[in-house]
């Protein structure tokens, strides 16, 4: 569960290291975001000489959360950290690589371009 003011790590090589969620897109009063949701975030920590700079506002897709997600077959899955992958306005990833596993739930939300970049899909 991601809410505004939540800090997230970045799963791609776009140049950002940490993001802070400022809005969950969807309904006008949406309070929480889960895997596969789009958020608007601000870059809090960045790598020097990379495309994304500190204090830049970006869109991102949540790919891992600490809060467990229940699947249709009864299995629950959770991760050790909250992680997002940065995207552009059309939903295409800004980075060329994704680090760490990505939850299978993000496939159902039409983010099929992030799935092939990931080394593992859980």
UniProtKB/Swiss-Prot annotation:
Gene3D superfamilies noted in UniProt: Ribosomal protein L14
Domain of life: Eukaryota
Keywords: Chloroplast, Plastid, Ribonucleoprotein, Ribosomal protein, RNA-binding, rRNA-binding
Protein name: Large ribosomal subunit protein uL14c
Gene that specifies this protein: rpl14
Disulfide-linked positions: none
Cited InterPro entries: Ribosomal_uL14 (IPR000218), Ribosomal_uL14_bac-type (IPR005745), Ribosomal_uL14_sf (IPR036853)
Keyword Cell inner membrane assigned: no
Compartments in which it is found: Plastid, Chloroplast
Subunit structure: Part of the 50S ribosomal subunit.
């Amino acid at each position: 569960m991601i809410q505004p003011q939540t800090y997230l790590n970045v799963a791609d090589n776009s140049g950002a290291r940490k993001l802070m969620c400022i809005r969950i897109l969807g309904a006008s009063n949406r309070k929480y975001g889960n895997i596969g949701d789009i958020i608007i975030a601000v870059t809090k920590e960045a790598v020097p000489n990379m495309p994304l700079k500190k204090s830049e506002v970006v869109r991102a897709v949540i790919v891992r959360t600490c809060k467990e997600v229940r699947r249709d077959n009864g299995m629950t899955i959770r991760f050790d950290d909250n992680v997002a992958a940065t995207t552009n306005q059309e939903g295409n990833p800004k980075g060329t690589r994704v680090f760490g596993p990505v939850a299978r739930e993000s496939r159902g939300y039409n983010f099929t371009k992030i799935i092939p970049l990931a080394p593992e899909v859980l």
